[in-house]
Amino acid sequence: FTYAVGKLVLWSSDANLVKNDVAAVLNSANVKHVAIANPKLAPYGEAAYQTLKSLGLEKAVEGKTVLGDNIGKTYQFVKTGNAEAGFIALSQCFKDGKFVSGSGYVIPQDLYSEIKQDAVLLKKGENNEGAKRFLKFLKESKEATAIRDAYGYGTAK
């Protein structure tokens, strides 16, 4: 079952770079590198490219793109300043309902395919009461929903 939905954000470690205009950031002379996870390997990378296409901004990142093998490496490119901005998971830079550092813009979820976070109970664990309780917690608990929201995830529809 899907217990959460990932959210994409255009983020920068520079607290003043990202406002609410993706095009302005990507076309800025100050942005020489834009980090994106490899879309062949990472759902957030695919979502980033879908967003660029939806907004007609594919050309804005030509020659500026730095591909990360995964979303963790992509975050590191931006966090360390090796890329001025990047498309990362909101959960990487968000805590208690706000950005931990830097600046970001949460990409509207209608611009990319849903990034589902799924949980399963393996056959080996079907008799494990702790595992069953944890899955029930993820599915039914208001506390679990509050935790997901606080750390930048959406709730599955």
Predicted regions, residues:
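Exported/periplasmic ABC-transporter solute-binding proteins
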Residues: F1-K157
